[in-house]
């Protein structure tokens, strides 16, 4: 589920990215606490927002925005939840952030679930550099069940992004209508986006994202590119980000 990004989270995310993060709606997954590693039911992540917050959206509540933007601020200022109104923030550094579908500068941004953990990014980049994406493409082409689930993941991704944007007061973003991320619904183009989706919503939603996570976990323990959210060894370099947010 999406939880508010604290000031410390934003500092960590800036260090992870090497820049000031833009359009952060919240933290969608954390290393050590990702839904993909906890066996969470996909249904519990519908919309990427907790059930209590879903009810608030359905009832039209605007006092506390479910993803961190006030309703009168459509595209940009990072804000905190009022005390006691958000879900409790789990332990662990951010692994995936939920990004606004339109960034503060007005640019459309289709990648709702954005992978930020440097260790995860490096591990996935290693898979891509070694041609593993072709294996995923072949799997998608050969298995109709996986292809069907992948297409459903595409539809859910767009629904979640649209819902979060509406809840944040951003409104429609026609430039990215029908566009999700990672090559969905028929191609495999970016493991980073697909892994980010899988970590954010939990297993059983994005079959290729789950497959990528399994490939990383199956590497030998001695392999520096082995990665799981539960065993992530990335540590914040205290000198990595010293600028203002």
Where do the model's predicted regions map?
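Preference for intrinsically disordered or flexible, low-complexity segments
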Residues: 1-39, 91-245
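Intrinsically disordered, low-complexity tandem-repeat regions
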Residues: 40-44, 48-88
């Amino acid at each position: 589920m999406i939880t508010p990004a604290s000031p410390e989270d934003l500092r960590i995310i800036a260090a992870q990215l090497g820049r000031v993060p833009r359009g952060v709606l919240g933290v969608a997954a954390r290393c050590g606490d990702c839904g993909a590693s906890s066996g969470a039911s996909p249904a519990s992540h519908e919309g990427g927002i907790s059930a209590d917050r879903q009810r608030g959206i359905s009832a039209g509540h605007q006092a506390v925005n479910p993803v961190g933007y006030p309703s009168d601020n459509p595209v940009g200022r990072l804000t905190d939840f009022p005390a006691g109104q958000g879900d409790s923030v789990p332990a662990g550094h951010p692994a995936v952030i939920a990004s606004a579908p339109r960034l503060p500068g007005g640019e459309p941004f289709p990648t709702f679930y954005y992978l930020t953990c440097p260790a995860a990014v490096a591990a996935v980049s290693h898979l891509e550099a070694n041609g593993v994406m072709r294996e995923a493409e072949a799997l998608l082409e050969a298995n109709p069940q996986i292809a069907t689930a992948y297409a459903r993941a595409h539809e859910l991704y767009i629904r979640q992004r649209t819902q979060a944007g509406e809840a944040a007061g951003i409104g429609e973003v026609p430039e990215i209508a029908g566009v999700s991320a990672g090559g969905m619904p028929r191609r495999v183009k970016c493991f980073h986006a697909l892994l980010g989706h899988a970590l954010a919503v939990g297993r059983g939603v994005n079959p290729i994202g789950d497959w990528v996570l399994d490939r990383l976990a199956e590497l030998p323990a001695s392999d520096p590119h082995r990665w799981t959210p539960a065993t992530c060894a990335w540590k914040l370099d205290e000198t990595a980000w010293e600028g203002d947010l």
